Regions:
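Transmembrane helix-loop-helix hairpins at the membrane interface
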Residues: 87-232, 344, 445
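Juxtamembrane coupling segments of multi-pass membrane pumps/enzymes
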Residues: 76, 198-260, 291, 341, ...
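Flexible metal-binding regulatory segments at protein termini and peripheral loops
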Residues: 1-126, 149, 241-242, 322, ...
Length: 739
């Protein structure tokens, strides 16, 4: 059996690894997998191990709870994330409030800033810094708890580097403070490094806060999907009375009435009435689907016209929408986090540096140096190997890269997305709202022996009583072109065919070929076929049985789509058009923009499966879409790119949002990611270069040949220089050319 649990208290990969490790040791547990981003534990076992799993996880220092229904669990997760972010914000504010004066007190005299007289006294100078540092340490206590725990577990991480580096600075500073109280006042300006510890803790806390804020938004996609389900439903009891009930309480077999404009609560089959249903949340297509008795309706879709009664056949977590939610969750969860080079190296770097520091101190003691000199060497090695530059190497480049992207209308949600985008070699594009404008428009007009203006006026009059998107396209066209039309005296919708309007005593029939044939009206079949072949939807108009002409309504291609596809091709990137539309419509659009690879008639699960197929074939896939139906595909791709003019669900599921809806942003995002990754590698090189060159000197290499002994202050300066180099290099991303 496979069970899922919600885990709380995890902050890094080491935490998730700890949970996996303790659960895997439980007898009977065949496999345990933790997803850090969704905070879920999945366990495969032969029997129910709930009690043992709860005990093991709680003993490891984490919280665990059962997974509730999708809707309830979403609310629980949202509240927990909100509480965590609130605490992080409070801790960050505390750290900032005390770090700023700490830095001022310790460094102000070096640049001529005035400081209070009493602080000029050595003892007061040291004690003031200690008092200011204590709240900062308290605010950043999580680094020490997680970092030291990882060290003791023999799995050091970035928190371990932060903890050991700042402990070294604080430890030496406390030692110097003791000497100051013994009369060594010269250590006042060369033995105290409290501000280094405070600044490091605060900067890292700021970075973690921003990282967690971005991570918290990954749940927005699921929340938005859950929001599609109405809270209540109108149930018809056996005695014929209707009652409003909680949608969560619905069971299979209940009769439910849905009025125009309402969302359908659960899946089912229509038993009475007809309607047009907006299923864009499933198919992504903007044109409603006509439904009759016996047709299936999907929970979360919108009834655009007509009242109907249906019988529920899937409720709760068994509905199509619930399946889509699970797909998004699983897709988000299946993304392996980018291999964080700094974290990997720190597993070796930390113990090696600690060993070098201890060995160096012991060697100099054996060589006859004093304990004070040995301590100075020990601290110098740890301080010069402080992970500040190492910790800044990746996040600073990512932050600047994100800022550069934002200035271009490319909003990158997190650093992982930016790094993933670098390797994209295949781009999958949805049609509606992505390559096309996303709404029907009149693209062709063929009057039959009647003035074009009068034809459009009569057509708009006939459609003015309809709420159908195709009708709206006609009336919108008339309005944009200054063509006046009157509202009909009456209008009757004809499901699956069109509509009948009465105006000035004349009958206007507007709709498809089926309507014309039913009423014995001859129409231009060649024009009808030509429009159909071009991918347009043909609409015809007849007045009192006389055919007046035909128009074509289609979703127009965006002006920049062709240029965007050409830009991707020039960079050696394959493009695919994957859509829910039929093959003819898909090919017509693909030909217009220059896409050669087409996959049509795809449901959301088909898109998801196709992406999985490409990825298993070694492709690095980016998915570009704008609709709710694209949510799972956006999440399952290596990189999800949403059009800013699309739905909130698509944007929440995506890694990158093109705010202006311009497809040329795809190639810009890829080039930006490559430039950023290049800067990250350079930063890591310089960070380690400073450390590897500085450590031998800090260990006393120069002193062994009669040279000076490196003081912790110079070590701290070297550490600062490495940070400055990393920051300056990252800032180059603001001006680097994207080729």
């Amino acid at each position: 059996m496979i069970k899922e649990y919600s885990i709380g208290g995890m902050s890094c990969a080491a935490c998730s690894a700890s949970v996996e490790r303790v659960v895997s040791k439980i007898p009977g547990a065949e496999a345990a997998s933790v997803n850090l981003s969704t905070e879920r534990l999945t366990v495969r076992s032969e029997r129910d191990l709930r009690a043992e799993i709860f005990a093991a996880v709680e003993k490891a220092g984490f919280t665990i709870s059962d997974i509730q229904s999708i809707k309830k669990q979403s609310a629980i997760d949202a509240e927990r994330r909100k509480k965590d972010m609130r605490q992080r914000k409070i801790n960050l504010i505390i750290a900032l409030v005390f770090t700023i004066p700490l830095f001022y007190v310790s460094m102000g005299h070096m640049i001529g800033l005035p400081i209070p007289k009493f602080i000029e006294e050595p003892k007061a100078f040291a004690i003031t810094q200690i008092l200011l540092l204590i709240p900062v340490i308290y605010a950043g206590r999580g680094f020490y708890v997680r970092g030291l725990k990882a060290v003791f577990a023999l799995h050091p991480n970035m928190d371990s580097l932060i903890a050991l580096g700042t402990i070294a600075s604080i430890g030496y500073s406390v030692y110097s403070t003791v000497l100051i109280f013994e009369g060594h006042h010269e250590l006042m300006h060369e033995g105290l490094y409290f501000e280094s510890a405070g600044v490091i803790i605060t900067l890292v806390m700021l970075g973690k806060y921003l990282e967690q804020r971005a991570k918290a938004k990954t749940g927005d996609a699921v929340s938005a999907l859950i929001g599609l389900t109405p809270d209540t439903a109108r149930v018809i009891y056996k005695d014929g009375t209707e009652h409003i009930v909680n949608a969560d309480e619905l069971v299979v077999g209940e009769r439910i009435r849905v009025f125009p404009g309402e969302r359908i609560p659960v899946d089912g089959i229509i038993t009475e009435g007809t309607s047009s249903i907006d299923e864009s949340m499933l198919s992504g297509e903007s044109i409603p689907v006509d439904k009759n008795v016996g047709d299936k309706v999907i929970g979360g879709s919108v009834n655009t016209s007509g009242s109907f009664i249906y019988v529920s056949d899937k409720v709760g977590d068994d509905t199509v929408l619930a399946g889509m939610i699970r797909m998004v969750e699983q897709a988000q969860g299946s993304k392996a986090p980018i291999a964080r080079l700094a974290d990997k190296i720190s597993g070796i770097f930390v113990p090696v540096v600690a060993a070098i520091a201890i060995i160096s101190a012991v060697i100099w003691l054996i060589a006859g140096e004093s304990f004070g000199v040995a301590i100075k060497i020990l601290v110098s090695v740890l301080v010069i190997a402080c992970p500040c530059a190492l910790g800044l190497a990746t996040p600073t480049a990512i932050m600047v890269g994100m800022g550069r992207g934002a200035s271009m209308g490319i909003f990158i949600k997190n650093g992982e997305a930016l790094e993933h985008t670098c390797g994209v070699d295949t781009v999958i594009l949805d049609k509606t709202g992505t390559i096309t404008c996303g709404k029907p428009d009149v693209v062709d007009i063929k009057p039959n022996g009647i003035d074009k203006g009068l034809f459009i006026s009569l057509f708009a009059c006939a459609e003015a009583g309809s709420e159908h998107p195709l009708a709206a396209a006609v009336t919108s066209y008339a309005g944009k072109n200054g063509i006046e039309y009157r509202n009909p005296d009456s209008y009757t919708a004809l499901a699956g065919r069109g509509g009948r309007a009465i105006s000035n005593g004349k009958e206007l029939l507007v709709g498809n070929d089926r309507l014309m044939k039913e009423n014995g009206i001859a129409f231009d079949e060649k024009a009808f076929e030509a429009l159909t072949m071009s991918g347009s939807t043909p609409l015809m108009l007849a007045e009192d049985g006389k055919y007046l002409g035909i128009i074509g309504v289609a979703d127009a291609v965006k002006p920049d789509s062709e240029a965007a596809i050409e830009s991707l091709r020039s960079h050696g990137i394959d493009t695919w058009l994957v859509t829910g539309d039929n093959e003819r419509t898909a090919k017509n659009v693909a030909d217009k923009v220059g896409i050669k690879n087409i996959k049509s008639s795809c449901l959301p699960e088909d898109k998801n499966g196709f992406i999985s197929f490409l990825r298993s074939s070694g492709k690095h896939v980016a998915m570009v879409g704008d609709g709710i139906n694209d949510a799972a595909a956006l999440a399952s791709a290596d990189v999800g790119i949403a059009i800013g003019t699309g739905t909130d669900v698509a944007m929440a599921s995506a890694d990158i949002v093109l705010a202006h809806g311009e497809l040329t942003g795809i190639s810009n995002a890829i080039m930006l990611s490559k430039a950023t990754l290049r800067i990250i590698k350079q930063n890591l090189f310089w960070a380690f270069a400073y450390n590897t060159l500085g450590i031998p000197i800090a260990a006393g290499l120069l002193h062994a040949f009669g040279g000076p002994l490196l003081s912790p202050m110079i070590a701290a300066l070297a550490m600062s220089l490495s940070s400055v180099t990393v920051l300056a290099n990252a800032l180059r991303l603001k001006v680097v050319k994207l080729k």
